[in-house]
């Protein structure tokens, strides 16, 4: 009698090096591991050669229209690939494309969802309120998904609190994901070249590093920096790029904030 192989496929359109650790971990527990993505950027860890990479369209965030088009095309590709190629696989949906997990309501695969960004809540950042028909339909679909899913994973207790409106607390697991690597070595402040370059030797640094898009509530740092202008020992750093960055820079300049610095993404 043949033994049924354990198979799993991850769905993540814009897979970065953080997903490599997930894939490598699944390789220790599953016979077949695949990922539907536009491509994978490897970090200090190499991806296990056992992983099968199945390409879908690349996520394009150059404009709202391109973002919606590539999300929609990616979602359609995911549906058909799961239907015809991965019928007997467990599925892990990441929230890119955010609509890809809708496929789970049409398929019989066991599945889990990893919530990096919370939709439809994130739509409010672009002016779509919770009373809008799109928002209400999305919310209804999400509740059905949560009822059917084996588990939901998210990044923090705060995000879990938001997700409780869609499903039971027992299903929602908090996993503060990040890439683990023995190659990441702490550098003492006195010898840190970044500290020296930006004159942070005698500062307490409050830093945000990542995307600065409409769905990222980083404007609170501007408000905190405004309230701490007289504390010369504190320096705020906002590192990254995104649609909201220009507005935040203008806001900081309008308030004449000397205690916050904006920097591009760092290597």
Question: Could you say what each language-model-derived stretch is?
Answer:
Residues 1-51, 228-230:
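N-terminal subdomain of nucleotide-sugar transferases
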Residues 17-20, 71-78, 83, 89-109, ...:
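An aromatic- and histidine-rich active-site surface loop
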Residues 37, 54, 135-189, 261-263:
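Donor nucleotide-sugar binding/catalytic pocket of nucleotide-sugar-dependent glycosyltransferases
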Residues 60-66, 112-143, 182:
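Acceptor-binding helix/loop patch of EC 2.4 sugar-transfer enzymes
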Residues 83-86, 101-102, 106, 119, ...:
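Membrane-proximal helix-turn-helix segments that form the acceptor-binding/catalytic region
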Residues 179, 199-216, 222-225, 237:
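Conserved donor-binding/catalytic core segment of Leloir-type glycosyltransferases
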Residues 185-199:
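A short helix/loop element that forms part of the nucleotide-sugar donor recognition site in Leloir-type
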Residues 240, 246-267:
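Nucleotide-activated donor-binding/catalytic signature segment of Leloir-type glycosyltransferases, i.e.
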């Amino acid at each position: 009698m043949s033994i049924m192989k354990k198979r799993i496929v991850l769905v993540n359109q814009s897979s970065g090096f953080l997903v490599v650790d997930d894939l490598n971990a699944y390789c220790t527990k599953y016979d077949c591991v695949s990922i539907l993505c536009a491509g994978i950027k490897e970090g200090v860890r190499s991806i296990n050669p056992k992983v099968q990479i199945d390409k879908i369209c690349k996520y394009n965030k150059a404009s709202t229209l391109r973002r919606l088009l590539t999300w929609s095309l990616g979602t359609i590709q995911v549906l058909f690939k799961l239907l015809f190629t991965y019928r007997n696989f467990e599925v892990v949906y990441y929230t890119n494309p955010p609509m890809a997990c809708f496929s789970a309501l049409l398929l019989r695969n066991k599945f889990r969802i990893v919530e990096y960004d919370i939709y439809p809540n994130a739509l409010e950042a672009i002016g779509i309120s919770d009373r809008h028909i799109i928002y209400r339909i999305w919310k209804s679909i999400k509740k059905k998904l949560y009822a059917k899913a084996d588990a939901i994973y998210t990044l923090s207790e705060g995000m879990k609190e938001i997700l409780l409106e869609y499903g039971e607390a027992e299903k929602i697991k908090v996993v503060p994901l990040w890439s683990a690597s023995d190659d990441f070595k702490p550098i003492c402040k006195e010898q840190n070249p970044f500290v020296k370059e930006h004159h942070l030797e005698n500062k307490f640094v409050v830093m945000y590093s990542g995307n600065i898009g409409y769905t990222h509530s980083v404007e609170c740092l501007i408000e905190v920096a405004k309230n701490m202008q007289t504390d010369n020992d504190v320096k705020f750093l906002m590192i990254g790029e995104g649609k909201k960055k220009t507005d935040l820079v203008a806001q900081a300049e309008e308030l004449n904030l000397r205690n916050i610095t904006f920097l591009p993404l760092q290597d």
